[in-house]
Regions:
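Hydrophobic alpha-helical transmembrane segments
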Residues: 18, 128-130, 156-160
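N-terminal signal-anchor/first transmembrane helix of integral membrane proteins
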Residues: 1-70
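Alpha-helical transmembrane segments of integral membrane proteins
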Residues: 81-89, 103-141
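Short, amphipathic, aromatic/basic-enriched membrane-interface segments that mark the entry/exit
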Residues: 96-104
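Alpha-helical transmembrane segments and their interfaces in multipass membrane proteins
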Residues: 29-49, 99-100, 138-165
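Juxtamembrane or sensor-core-proximal signal-transducing alpha helices
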Residues: 164-176
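Membrane-embedded alpha-helical segments of multi-pass membrane proteins
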Residues: 51-55, 107-112, 160, 164
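A generic, lipid-embedded transmembrane alpha helix
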Residues: 27, 53-58, 82-93
Length: 176
């Protein structure tokens, strides 16, 4: 264990975190399949949702697997790109399905928020803000195309929630 006390820097901590992430993504996969079956996903919707799932799993793995507190530039680039493309794929899938219910897609959008919170805690505050802004713009542009009268409810709370965590993290990191 190193002197910094970073949970992910010690081997047992990494195994525990990896196990928790594996359980989370198995549960997310099961929930996505059940939601897709109930919502009668089309082949294109399945493809978009599967792409989002894979990209979010990659983003979380890269974010959580670094042995140091701060992520390297290439890791940050992978995470940012994966989260933005995943969010675009989720919103695009919802729009293509034309369903008024966004429920089947909420877990993926929530997972993107979780990835960004962990990303912020790994020393990438500014990039986390940029990704939140880009994801919010994607939701505002594509959200109306879903046909759901409550699409904005899926965009703004996540943006606010993520920004709250980022602001809190920034305050903690900048505090004396």
């Amino acid at each position: 264990m190193t002197g910094s006390g970073d949970f992910l820097e010690n081997l047992p901590g990494r195994w525990i975190a990896g196990g928790i992430l594996a359980i989370y993504f198995v549960a997310l996969g099961v929930r996505t399949v059940v939601n897709g079956r109930l919502a009668d996903f089309t082949a294109v919707t399945w493809a978009g949702t599967t792409l989002a799932f894979v990209l979010l799993a990659i983003a979380m793995t890269v974010t959580a697997s670094s042995a140091t507190s701060a992520l390297a530039d290439w890791q940050a680039g992978v995470v940012c790109g994966a989260v933005v493309i995943a969010v675009a794929a989720v919103w695009g899938s919802a729009a293509l399905l034309g369903s008024e219910a966004l429920g089947p897609f909420q877990t993926m959008l929530s997972t993107a928020t979780i990835v960004l919170v962990v990303f912020m805690m790994r020393g990438r505050l500014l990039l986390a803000w940029v990704v939140v802004a880009v994801n919010t713009v994607i939701g505002v542009i594509v959200g109306p195309l879903t046909g759901s009268p409550t699409w904005l409810n899926a965009v703004l709370p996540r943006a606010s929630f993520t920004m709250l965590f980022i602001a809190t993290g920034a305050a903690l990191l900048l505090a004396p």
